[in-house]
């Protein structure tokens, strides 16, 4: 027998043995328990829009379905607003969303103003951390819920701490609770296709001289299990004269398993209204040279449409046909491979005095 014939025979025997063991595994553990990656029906990860076009681009499309997402940042940086927009996007597409309000601080009026259908939003205000995470697990296993938001990890108080007296030390109880919960729910999340967003707060490590002293609550388990981690910060307060009407938020993608990480997105959050979608649109239109900025003036197809950013946004909101056309042109350019840089995006109330550099826009070969 030649060497080539010997290799062919061995290959056939291996294929036969592989088919037998794959069949045995599927009989024991169910269909889909093992598969060839090329045969998987979920090769491309589907996404849920964040409500901010700039953040969607930074994430590679939005929040991934069937994954764990962590959003953390300082107080009043826009964490809850960000998740309420995600809930609104899910509901627009006919999906079901749940909000586990461990902080007992959800404002239904504000949620409704962001486009959330509060009548059909599932809300739970659990008494203990164990109760909250058990509810999350059951919602996931039902395969009937598309998005679950937990606000927040810091408020998931273990039962032992609640039943104890004030001042009792229950060291590591919350970290152990989160570690056990993540082990339990991660597999169910992948099977159901449900996205779970955990909001988290920041704490300062004691005695840190060098490096970043900030850390998130609930131990390290969530950091490992999360496919996406977003660090959201307030970088500017938006004012008209002395009146404050919003904030400029900056989001850094600290971790991303489904797209390139460490991208940065900026957008405006208006008090009582949420994320300024038109502001995001203007940012990207300016970056892709669809709308040109010369000094303080913005022009579209050679005609001035507004002096200053505020006036340009108002003009776009009043001319919906052109606004929709600009949005279509942006999506077309991005599909063709135009890459935008968030570093040149300005705040909502800024009146720039110089034109955008052509070098800020790079075309991917």
UniProtKB/Swiss-Prot annotation:
For whether the record's keyword set contains Cytoplasm, the answer is yes
**Could you state one GO biological process linked to this protein?**
SOS response
Q: Which GO terms describe its cellular component?
A: cytosol
Q: Which PANTHER family match?
A: MITOCHONDRIAL DNA REPAIR PROTEIN RECA HOMOLOG-RELATED, RECA
- Name recorded for this polypeptide: Protein RecA
Q: Which GO terms describe its molecular function?
A: ATP binding; ATP hydrolysis activity; ATP-dependent DNA damage sensor activity; damaged DNA binding; single-stranded DNA binding
Please indicate which superkingdom the organism of origin belongs to: Bacteria
Q: Which CDD domains match?
A: RecA
Q: Which SMART domains has this protein been placed in?
A: AAA
* Described function: Can catalyze the hydrolysis of ATP in the presence of single-stranded DNA, the ATP-dependent uptake of single-stranded DNA by duplex DNA, and the ATP-dependent hybridization of homologous single-stranded DNAs. It interacts with LexA causing its activation and leading to its autocatalytic cleavage.
Name the family: Belongs to the RecA family.
Question: Which amino acid positions bind ATP, per UniProt?
Answer: 73-80
SUPFAM superfamilies, per this entry?
P-loop containing nucleoside triphosphate hydrolases (SSF52540), RecA protein, C-terminal domain (SSF54752)
Which Pfam families would you find in this protein's record? RecA, RecA_C
- The primary site where this protein sits is cytoplasm
- Location in the cell: Cytoplasm
Q: What is the originating organism of this protein?
A: Prochlorococcus marinus (strain MIT 9215)
DNA damage listed as a keyword: yes
Q: Which NCBIfam families match?
A: tigrfam_recA (TIGR02012)
């Amino acid at each position: 027998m030649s060497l080539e014939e010997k290799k062919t025979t061995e290959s056939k025997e291996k294929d036969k043995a592989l088919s037998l063991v794959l069949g045995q595994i599927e009989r024991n553990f169910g269909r889909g328990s093992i598969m060839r990656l090329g045969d998987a029906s979920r090769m491309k990860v589907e996404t849920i829009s964040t409500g901010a076009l700039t953040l969607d681009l930074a994430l590679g499309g939005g929040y991934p379905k069937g994954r764990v997402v962590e959003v953390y940042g300082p107080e009043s940086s826009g964490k809850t607003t960000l998740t309420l927009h995600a809930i609104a996007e899910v509901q627009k597409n006919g999906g079901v969303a749940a909000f586990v309000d461990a902080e007992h601080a959800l404002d239904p009026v504000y949620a409704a103003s962001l486009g959330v259908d509060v009548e059909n939003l599932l809300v739970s205000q659990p008494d203990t951390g164990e109760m909250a995470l058990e509810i999350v697990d059951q919602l996931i296993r039902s395969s009937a819920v598309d998005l679950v938001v937990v606000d927040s990890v810091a408020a998931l108080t273990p039962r032992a701490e609640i039943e104890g007296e004030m001042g009792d030390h229950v060291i590591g109880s919350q970290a152990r609770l989160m570690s056990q919960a993540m082990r339990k729910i991660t597999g169910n999340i992948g099977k159901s296709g449900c996205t779970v967003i955990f909001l988290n707060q920041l704490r300062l490590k004691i005695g840190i001289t060098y490096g970043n002293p900030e850390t998130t609550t609930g131990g390290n388990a969530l950091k490992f299990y999360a496919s996406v981690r977003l660090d959201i910060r307030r970088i500017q307060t938006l004012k008209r004269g002395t009146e404050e009407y919003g904030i400029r938020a900056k989001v850094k993608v600290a971790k991303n398993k489904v797209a390139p990480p460490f991208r940065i997105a900026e957008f405006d959050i208006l008090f009582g209204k949420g994320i300024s979608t038109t502001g995001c649109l203007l940012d990207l239109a300016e970056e892709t040279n669809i709308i040109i900025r010369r000094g303080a003036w913005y022009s579209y197809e050679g005609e001035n449409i507004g002096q200053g950013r505020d006036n340009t946004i108002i003009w776009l909101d009043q001319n919906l046909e052109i606004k929709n056309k600009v949005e279509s042109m942006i999506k077309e350019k991005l599909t063709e491979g135009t890459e935008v840089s968030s570093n040149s995006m300005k705040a909502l109330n800024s009146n720039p005095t110089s034109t955008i550099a052509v070098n800020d826009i790079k075309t991917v070969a």
